[in-house]
Amino acid sequence: MSVTLHLRGETKPLEHRAALTPTTVKHLIGKGFKIYVEESPQSIFKIDEYRRAGAIIVPFGSWISAPRDRIIIGLKEMPEEDKFPLVHEHIQFAHCYKDQAGWKDVLRRFINGNGTLYDLEFLEDDNGRRVAAFGFYAGFAGAALGLADWAFKQTHKDSEDLPAVSPYPNEKALIKDIGKAYKNALKTGAKKPKVLIIGALGRCGSGAIDFLKKVGLPEENIIKWDIQETSRGGPFPEIAASDIFINCIYLSKPIAPFINYELLNKPDRKLRTVVDVSADTTNPHNPIPIYNIATVFNKPTVKVNTSSGPKLSVISIDHLPSLLPREASEFFAHDLLPSLEQLPSRHVSPVWVRAEKLFNRHSARAIRESKL
């Protein structure tokens, strides 16, 4: 059975990544897939790259009226104001399985249209490991912005916030830019920061470590924590004693907070910047309960209202890999490709069968809870 994929243009502001790259489009067409690609003004990839790869180019937003047998693939969630029923099979990150704000409304659109959601976050292999994730570049970009904010605080007044950031064409340009800010901060007499990473052994943590090493932070300044170190339960004074804290955990169940105001309001606190890569902002079990808004590239930080100690900011951008959209997209699409190749047999392929069962389970829960 041949499969037709329709790559929809992203609508989330400043989202420049793509679920399919020209490289993967060319590969899938070679396997017998038919692929439509929407014109997308914000994609890092030029439409001609897709055209040369063999895709059929269609107008932005045309997925809405596309034939029902097309599988619609995208990355981020659709605009909140859209309410029309979803009639297709969709592959995307929907952020609606962990009780996030508005999760029932998201699922209701699929239920009302008799559509199906294959959530990219929950495509897992037989060992329960995600088949594809942006974690590495989320950690890489998160560490970059965390160091940028720390450096900015050394060279600017507390009344100023880290200015807007824009995507970089490649990793080398990002390292050069943040490295320059870091060196300027050290010229003020500031000591090299200590960075504590929780979730250091995962994809995200390894990305954060990789950036910090490449920008020149000494190994001894990178404090790597994972399950063993956090097993005693928070809050952890070690976080307040670090200069930068990067949260890279995958939140799957309620846990004790990592940090609280009692630790933050001490006058000797060193912590200046928190990077919540996980960005479970609206999750009731968020282990960093010191902020309540997701930040954006245009305004990357939010100030924490502490009563003592130096200025403290949180970075909680939920699409950090978009700072390096081309490399992040290629990395992700490469890992996703083997699962996409199984789409012709998705009704028996374990990866897709599990994803559909999960969708059905949460849909039933949404219906049940809406009736309560």
UniProtKB/Swiss-Prot annotation:
A motif (Microbody targeting signal) lies at residues 370-372. GO terms for molecular function: mRNA binding; saccharopine dehydrogenase (NAD+, L-lysine-forming) activity. The keyword Cytoplasm does not apply. The keyword Magnesium does not apply. Disulfide bonds join 204-248. L-saccharopine binds at residues 17, 76, 100, 130, 134, 278-280. InterPro entries: AASS, AlaDH/PNT_N, AlaDH/PNT_NAD(H)-bd, Lys1, NAD(P)-bd_dom_sf. CDD domains: SDH (cd12188). It is found in: Peroxisome. Pathway: Amino-acid biosynthesis; L-lysine biosynthesis via AAA pathway; L-lysine from L-alpha-aminoadipate (fungal route): step 3/3. It holds the Pfam family AlaDh_PNT_N. It catalyses: L-saccharopine + NAD(+) + H2O = L-lysine + 2-oxoglutarate + NADH + H(+). GO terms for biological process: lysine biosynthetic process via aminoadipic acid; protein import into peroxisome matrix. Belongs to the AlaDH/PNT family. This is Saccharopine dehydrogenase [NAD(+), L-lysine-forming]. It comes from Candida glabrata (strain ATCC 2001 / BCRC 20586 / JCM 3761 / NBRC 0622 / NRRL Y-65 / CBS 138) (Yeast).
